Amino acid sequence: MAKRGHTQRPAGDVDDARMLAASNEPENWLLNGGTFGGERYSLLDQINTVNVGRLQPAWYFEYDTTRGQEAEPIVVDGVMYVSTSWSKVYALDAATGRQLWFYDPEVAGTDGAKACCDVVNRGVAVYEGKVFVGALDGRLIALDARTGKVVWSTMTIDPDSMQTITGAPRVVRGKVIIGNAGADFGVRGHVSAYDAATGKLAWRFYLVPGDPEKGPDGAASDEIMEKLVRPTWAGDYASYGGGGTAWQTIMYDPDFNRIYIGTGNGSPWNPKYRTAGKGDNLFLCSVVALDADTGKYIWHYQENPQEAWDYNSTQPMILAELDIEGRRRKVLMHAPKNGFFYVIDRQTGRLISAAPTVPTTWASRIDIATGRPVEPANARYTEGPFLAKPGTAGSHNWHAMAFSPKTGLAYLPVAENQSLLQTNPDFRPVPMGPFNHGVISRHGAGASYLLAWDPVKQREAWRVPYRGGGVLATAGGLLFQGRGTVIGEFVALRADDGRQLWSWPTPNGIQAAAVTYMVGGVQYVAISTGAGAGAMTGGAEARMRQPGRMVAFRIGGKATLPREPDPAPPANPAPGPFAQEVVDRGAAVYRNYCYRCHGPDAISSNVIPDLRRSAYLPDKEAWRAVVWDGALESSGMIGWSRYLESEQIEELRAYVSWEATRLKNGQAPGARQTGSRRSSQAVVQEQ
């Protein structure tokens, strides 16, 4: 069906009424998720199952950063607003890709070391002439939508903590709502609302209890914190931070004037340390409903009581109406990391149904009467190792899922994996170092696929095997999804049966979700490309680093994309030899401090440098200048003199050189082990 083009309006002219009626103007993409329902479904059908084979690039735009790209752009009246890694923001002409303005918040490179999983950003919000972005360093920034100039900026976290921001803000009735990340590093999660016009704090809601000796927080959460939350914790939880960060999903429900928050994992993971093995630990791994105006608690549903597997519940939600057992129900659909697909009553917070989308060992089922999982003995590895399925990487992570009212199906990228977990008896929190997990872990990956799921029948409709990113559904009967960890492919499939109809190679891997919009009567499909997210790409083929790109497609497009990047340089080991005990000590240093960015066993796709190929590796003094002195701090590689001993720098070089020699000789990688344990090498790329 033909859709009208955009009318001439002031830049960023989006108000509450327009957001509420976003589905009535599919030529725009006004909100993260498309509408307040987050369906990521567009009524545009100019591109459809008949003509999608003629889809070609219309334009592309190169960012100034080579790190991971996870943002979903916002398109308002022919202007695209998109954030990139390092929290930078571009305004582009949505028809041509021409840059209108650019904003760099100048996040310090040292803040990159606080991020668990790359310096990514998942998007902006546009409201009343402003563009809002959460910066990695914790600032919430309002920009003039016409010029990109700063209107106001406020710090939302303790800048001395390990908290960061990677999620997109949500604007609701004149307030900008933002969460934060950092649960793997011992922080206390909270969500804050700020006046969109002034940046003044309106309310704050803490998601786990703080130090009881310090008294109330003076926050919207105070009453429910003492009445309901704190009694579910035990032991010295306050000294560990607790976790529960809301690093991604914040939804608004106009039917009830509520926001829904997806909360994160515990800090540390192991409840033996976090809470003396007692209590449910509210509000970890929960969906929490709050009054949008005041931040007051309304209800919660906890998907993982006494969380122990990094099964956070921050993943995307979809708000919809479904016909269930003869009744029209207002529901919230959620597929968190724990492997189950939940359908929850939005009004009451009660569970309607839940079923596993992948093999699960941590729970056999979810009891509908109580809403609680039915767990086996030793699920929390209290009596020895436990093989958790899915593993700590989760079955469905931050990647967007979509819902088509046309097919009645939800579409989500899913992965089967497993983790062997056991208590680490030597655990102690270490600042800026390893994840504060309290576990020893091994990990294995299995099948990955795009899953079409019937939320009413709670069963699979179909699957297509491959590892992919976020999903977009359209009225043209199509699904769009990106693939690839270093170089990529953008594909279109039939929404009814998953049959692939079209694909286009991209020089960058793709993680983000696409959006679609119309300018001048022409429908476009656009996606931000560029893989990253730390060690998640550790097993991928290493290539030369390249900038991320926004790529827009249209029927009969004429643009030519750049060619794929060349292979990365060869292994570059130091002359050596190094004593084996020195290599072993260096392996321990690497596992504790380096792998979360540079990959397990020193294997990296080179989005973040593959150290085995580093030009600094053969030169002892050059290596020391970078790793000890911080010569590359502006790029995010801090100097580790505050956390390591001087001799450990050379031990680290010995280990990386050992791995480089194995690569050069065609041998399989394998981190040296010291004793009977290895530190956690969890691939938990999410925040």
Regions found by a protein language model. Name each.
Residues 515-567:
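Blade-level signature of beta-propeller repeat domains, shared across WD40, Kelch, NHL, RCC1
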